[in-house]
Amino acid sequence: MIMMQFACPLLKRAFFLSALSLLAGTTLVHAQADSLDDHKLTEVYTPVPPVVTPAAKFGEAPSDAVILFNGRNLDEWVKVSDGSPADWIVSKDILTVNKTSGNIQTKRSFTNYQLHLEYRIPANITGSDQARGNSGLFLASTGKGDDGYELQILDNYNNPTYTNGQVGSIYKQSIPLANPCRKPGEWQTYDVAWVAPVFNTDGSLASPAKVTVFLNGVLVQNSYELKGQTRYRGKPYYKAHGPSPIKLQAHGDKSEPISFRNIWVRPS
């Protein structure tokens, strides 16, 4: 073996320091690799999600849901106009719009939630365009009348209209991704995930509302960011508000009134 000869002790010392540094670096790399390979470093145990008992049948309310319409009464609802008890028609587990009474909304207010609702356009529906089975699900009611954010309800089974006003649209804002409308006389379902807008202390918008909507099990709105509250004329805009009721619309068209059942919400 050939031994390396050093010209001076200083060079010899520098060589050994360099070798020691290289050894330390190699050890550190191996230590880091070992840490990355430790699966426990990426495991999280808290918080623990709450246990929710799912419904026996799809569409029925899970154990933590707030039942908004139980098929028997309107204890969870009031008139939008004056806050008096809602007087839409309840019969045989079905809620039917009373067009002479006006819109109704929940007594409770909500922020973010999951909502399930079923509706039916009458089999004998008449009219056309927007005057055929028109109603609306307001995801947050922010005042009287039609103030708020409207998810359109309309008969669009062989009934053309403007596309940002058909069923599944965020009215006058977002065209639905598909038209899975069933025939009049058949029950239809809305499943909604709503994220309310957030406002700064000065009333300015911090983050917009977002909504994901399934109509009859088909995705029609995919995490859509709303531009503001619904407006029939003009551009939508935001106005600061807090937790809000959910509203159902009694539309003024002359077609036969629509019906609802199985309405529940899971606040999140």
Regions found by a protein language model. Give the residues of each.
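N-terminal secretory signal peptides that target proteins for export/translocation
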Residues: 1-10
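Serine/threonine-rich, low-complexity intrinsically disordered segments
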Residues: 4, 28-29
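Bacterial N-terminal signal peptides
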Residues: 14-26
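Carbohydrate-interacting regions of secretory-pathway proteins
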Residues: 31-268
